[in-house]
Regions:
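Extended alpha-helical targeting/anchoring segments
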Residues: 1-532
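Active-site flanking residues adjacent to catalytic metal/cofactor-binding acidic residues
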Residues: 366, 538-539, 697
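Cysteine-nucleophile active-site neighborhood
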Residues: 573-649, 653-655
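Generic structural signal for residues in well-ordered beta-strands
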Residues: 559-561, 625, 673
Length: 731
């Protein structure tokens, strides 16, 4: 281990801080921290997702912090979790004594309890974030420990959805448990930071020098006292009382109700959800590691909140991030399932970007988000710096906007946070009406879902993620809530499916049934149909011949590639079971293709042509070629076939790549057209009596990869040759 330079500084209140740093083992430190959170209070925030200019990979966390902040409704309790916390409490009590938002404040050696004023002065909408709330109290705590000397010290934890009711007048319909907590934050004094870009993990240790309850001098120090805490082992549940808070068909009914609100103009969009329940038999740390490995995200988290309550998060969405005066958010709206491979992903991305419904979703979300920022930002400073950008996760593809602004000098990070409470992407628009719909129509309280997780720094900065794709584990039961963004274009059945798709990765992580969404690529195609087959490919100076050759070799064909003159000599002298006429530039005549075909016919060798190869076969048998009005170079077309053996197992309509300027104008009677393109061009032929087949499109192209169409076609060619060879050998 390596000890780094110590730093010392004074906070705004005069509290003295000494920070030392120790380098830990990069490979094991974070995993050990995660394991300790199964039984001890603390937080691990983990960003395992990268996006240029937005997200990098890092971990930050701690265990056994000295102080815990617990908010319930209009009350807050600040608990010392060990003797080190008891030393800090008097300073916090002093900081809160003049807070106008507090109606009653009580201090004791091991805790501070307070309640908020029931009525406060009226504020303009621009100053709503200054309304008396638990955040008024947090603002005083932050001011007490304020210093620009350290970027890590601060408050870490979870902000519940119900905190919004301290700012917005929403009529309550849900039945809530009085023991439920709206806010749980920790003030740590030992913070582990892992930077995955440099492969280094540092443990920062903090010591404080404070004043006692009745002292005016800073003489009380945490130095010399152990960082201890009470262990409370995780207790799993074996079963749940229900699988979902919605009965079959109920969520679809909620969507249909929302459509009526849209038609009347009461809402533009709304984001209701449903909750799924699973017995969480494995520990939260185990579930977290599964989720982190299989569902990387920018706002992953494992939190032991005490009272047998844990949060396991893989959130894809930034809530609010503040750095100095700059405030930014990344609203997500627009979702589609990932494809089976990279080609499938590309198709899905195209579908998503072409979806008017998904574009409307995100546009409305970003307009509301810009409005939230305009409450606290300098006029004209709010800008959309990224529009409908693609972010890809284990099972889902999202469209994301990136919005930045610069806050007015009179506002701080908490103002920026509160101006967005809560994000339009989990509520709707207009926001107040959407929250009222959610409160009235959802089947259970949201708890932490739709709130935020993260860090409020004593340096004035803030980094929080939206609490979604998050498992709440309470008394051994995993609660997984997922929502769908509804608007007038919504299909009720599809929206219900989307909630289940979003929840699926978390449910599988709880069950231990990990499935990759894509990410590992398509299965490598191979078959043994070509064993014993010797093929010769004539290279017509094309740039794709080796891709085509690889497809045949994946079918176990022994293949040799030669330029035309050498190929004709080889044909005369060697045994060849299949002649492949490759694509190429120019015309068949340029490569004397008629001479090549002549030799193959004399020796009774089956022929398969691609692109230029098809054109050469057509010309050899008396057909004509013509020039396309517009060249098809690197273009994908929809191809329709008529069911020949060449297309066995291939959909009657499929997409394939084209690279050609010439096309068959007339096809002689001895050749049969077996496939055409959407522009009615000849795309495949076969001889009426001889083993000759050809395609105009490129089966080896990336544009022909969907559903492994190109591979299957080549397999069919090889299978046909193998069958013919077997029949000849049997004679």
């Amino acid at each position: 281990m390596q000890t780094n330079t110590q730093i010392q500084y004074k906070c705004a209140s005069g509290v003295q801080v000494r920070r030392s740093a120790v380098q830990l083992d990069y490979q094991t430190a974070v995993d050990q921290l995660a394991a300790s959170l199964d039984h001890s209070p603390g937080v691990l925030l983990a960003s395992s997702f990268e996006f240029p200019g937005r997200y990098t990979r890092w971990d930050i966390g701690f265990v056994n912090p000295p102080l815990q902040f617990i908010g319930r409704g209009n009350s807050l309790e600040i608990k010392a979790l060990n003797i080190r916390g008891e030393i800090l409490l008097p300073e916090i009590y002093r900081a809160l004594q003049d807070c106008k938002a507090i109606e009653q404040l009580d201090g004791a050696p091991q805790s501070i309890s307070l309640s908020l004023v029931t009525e406060s002065e009226e504020f303009s909408e621009e100053l709503r974030s200054r309304k008396a709330s638990l955040f008024s109290v947090l603002r005083e705590v932050i001011a007490c420990f304020a210093s620009a000397s350290d970027p890590y010290l601060g408050l870490y934890g979870a902000f519940g959805y119900d905190l919004t009711f301290q700012f917005e007048d929403v009529i309550r319909y849900q039945t809530r448990n009085a023991e439920d907590r709206d806010l749980v934050l920790y003030l740590p004094d030992q913070i582990i930071v892992a930077d995955h870009r440099v492969g280094k993990t540092i443990c920062y240790n903090y010591e404080f020098v404070c004043r006692g309850w009745d002292a005016e001098k800073f003489t009380e120090t945490t130095g010399g006292f152990r960082r201890s805490g009470v262990k409370s082992p995780y207790v799993p549940a074996l079963h749940t009382a229900q699988d979902c808070d919605h009965k079959a068909g109920e969520f679809v009914e909620r969507v249909e109700q929302a459509l009526e609100y849209f038609r009347r103009g009461d809402l533009f969009e709304v984001v209701p959800g449903q909750t799924f329940y699973e017995p969480c038999k494995d520990s939260p740390a185990t579930v977290f590691q599964r989720l982190k490995e299989n569902n990387p995200s920018p706002y992953g988290a494992l939190m032991n909140l005490g009272e047998q309550e844990y949060l396991v998060a893989a959130s894809p969405e930034m809530f609010v991030r503040v750095d100095g005066r700059q405030i930014e958010t990344c609203p997500i709206s627009g979702t589609i399932k990932r494809g089976d491979d990279a080609i499938g992903d590309a198709t899905q991305i195209k579908t998503l970007l072409n979806s008017a419904k998904d574009e409307s979703e995100l546009s409305m979300c970003t307009d509301v988000d810009r409005n939230d920022k305009s409450r606290v930002c300098e006029p004209g400073s709010v800008r959309v710096v990224g529009r409908r950008q693609i972010e890809m996760y284990s099972r889902l593809i999202h469209t994301v906007d990136h919005v930045k602004g610069y806050m007015k000098a009179e506002f701080d990070a908490l103002d920026g946070f509160l101006a967005h409470t809560w994000a339009v992407t989990v509520t709707g628009a207009p926001k107040l009406a959407a929250m009222q719909f959610i409160e009235q129509q959802e089947k259970s309280p949201r708890h932490w879902y739709g709130g935020a997780i993260g860090h409020i720094g004593f340096d004035g900065n803030l980094n929080t993620g939206l609490t979604l794709r998050t498992i709440r584990v309470k008394d051994g039961v995993a609660q997984i809530r997922a929502g769908a963004t509804l608007l007038i274009d919504s299909d009720p059945v599809e929206e219900e499916k989307e909630t289940r798709l979003k929840a699926s990765a978390l449910i599988d992580a709880v069950r231990g049934q990990i499935k990759s969404g894509q990410g590992k690529g398509a299965e490598v195609f191979s078959c043994g149909d070509g064993l014993g087959i010797k093929a010769l490919m004539v290279d017509h100076q094309d740039s794709f011949v080796h891709n085509l050759a690889a497809y045949f070799r994946q079918c176990s064909v022994e293949l040799t590639t030669l330029r035309p003159e050498a190929a004709r000599k080889y044909l005369k002298d060697q045994r060849v079971d299949l002649l492949i006429l490759s694509p190429g530039p120019s015309t068949p005549e340029h490569f004397a293709m008629k001479a090549t075909i002549e030799i193959a016919l004399e020796k009774g060798i089956p022929i398969f042509g691609v692109c230029l190869g098809l054109q050469g076969i057509v010309e050899y048998f008396g057909g004509d070629l013509t020039q396309l009005g517009y060249p098809m170079h690197g273009k994908q077309s929809l191809i329709t076939h008529q069911g020949s053996a060449l297309f066995a197992g291939i959909a009657s309509e499929f997409s394939a790549g084209r690279y050609h300027s010439l096309i068959a104008k007339t096809v002689p009677a001895c050749l049969r057209v077996t496939a055409t393109s959407e522009d009615n061009s000849v795309m495949a032929i076969e001889h009426q009596s001889l083993p000759i087949q050809a395609v105009q499109f490129h089966p080896e192209s990336i544009m022909s990869l969907e559903n492994q169409t190109g591979h299957r076609l080549i397999q069919n060619v090889v299978a046909g040759v193998a069958k013919l060879k077997s029949m000849q050998e049997a004679v």
